[in-house]
């Protein structure tokens, strides 16, 4: 039962989606002329069938198709005036040029997993359009060079599947949830079960094609190293629209091993979590053991780049308290492990190409980083939070290994050496009227954890977007650096200033903007 509950949470985290239509409100009067002029401009370069106005019969289904958090499926949500579905980079260029010319800002959606929905909605009324990358999802693999080009609209599952089809000897270090869009994931860093071996997805990006705020299509050489640095972990949308990415593929062995061991409180879960927080970051980088803590216990979930025999020897030597043995092992290919970890034994390689889900839930998320071990006595207090009304789950990923050998300034993603593990607080509920308890639980446990996590700043992961951390203030039609610094240093630490200076060079008028976009520092 505990294992099935853990799989259920994993599926919710990875695949919450919706297909229902929502009520549409009429655009405000000031938007009328903007809409007409913008549409006229777009239709010069983009086929009309790829444009959706609010008056279009298909608008609601297109907009909601990848809304992963259904609390935003509401007539109160501020939606785009237009949705543009490009099929090539020239369509993206046209959208930006027309948007600049006619005062229409652009937001960008790849997979729709932005936890706060900022890729397809606005917190406040304003005229904007969404460039929905869903139709740009090509994956091209060069097995000999061990590289791939992947469009931003592809899902991680598309990329993983394409890699394995080209070569069983290659893999890529990105997220566990296979329905996540490449564009947003890479833009925020992106990590999964190969984090300790190969770092983040962004660490392994070697080129990109970006449409900048002037509508130019730039590769790495043309954009320059500061711009290229910024798109690899500086958060989506701030520095242009990435049409496609070139990534370095990494070797994986013929067989990998996974295990999932659940321990209840009465089976010593608290002792094991206390031990895990120092053992897991110090293990060889071929082994990643993460934890999903919920209710009365914890699930220890692992990927090992090697055989069951070798893994049992390693666990017996380094973490014997867990009691892991050969009966817990499942050997498989790397690509088979990709669906197995989030979906369990029923997950298949073909599932990686699935872009839909019938699961519908509301959600709230927060994140933390732990730099010092938490005493057992405090873990006992933490676990009491997991049985409170409205409680969710704590997902904990260990660092160390390869990720710790990279300088903090190598990319905007700054979590490298000195981090034991990160925490994602996740809570789901069903039905609009049920929001109060789970939402408050998330904020309350976050407050409770203050003494145990990073400080000055209290760090967070930008791909676990959280508007509780702060939002931009706009003065003179430009986001202010002071307001952005409040939340920005939590995501990026000392890299935030360089991001803001880069923004000031390439988009000083702050065209690409949302509630947590990088402000220009001039």
Curated annotation (Swiss-Prot):
InterPro entries: BBE, FAD-bd_PCMH, FAD-bd_PCMH-like_sf, FAD-bd_PCMH_sub1, FAD-bd_PCMH_sub2, Oxid_FAD_bind_N
Sorted UniProt keywords: Allergen, Disulfide bond, FAD, Flavoprotein, Glycoprotein, Nucleotide-binding, Oxidoreductase, Signal
Free-text description of this protein's post-translational modifications in UniProt: The FAD cofactor is bound via a bicovalent 6-S-cysteinyl, 8alpha-N1-histidyl FAD linkage. The N-terminus is blocked.
Cofactor, how bound (note): Binds 1 FAD per subunit in a bicovalent manner.
Domain of life per record: Eukaryota
Disulfide bond entries: 41-98, 308-329
Cofactor(s) needed for function: FAD
EC number: 1.-.-.-
TM region positions: none
Signal peptide location: 1-25
Binding site for FAD: 108-114, 119, 152, 176-177, 181-185, 191, 237, 242, 461-465
Tissue-by-tissue expression: Expressed in pollen (at protein level).
Glycosylated residue positions: 88, 325, 354, 477
Ranges for domain FAD-binding PCMH-type: 76-252
GO molecular function, one term: FAD binding
PROSITE patterns: FAD_PCMH (PS51387)
Cross-link for 6-(S-cysteinyl)-8alpha-(pros-histidyl)-FAD (His-Cys), residue positions: 113-177
UniProt subunit comment: Monomer.
Protein family (similarity comment): Belongs to the oxygen-dependent FAD-linked oxidoreductase family.
PANTHER family in the record: OS08G0158400 PROTEIN
Name recorded for this polypeptide: Berberine bridge enzyme-like Cyn d 4
Provenance organism: Cynodon dactylon (Bermuda grass)
Lineage of producing organism: Eukaryota, Viridiplantae, Streptophyta, Embryophyta, Tracheophyta
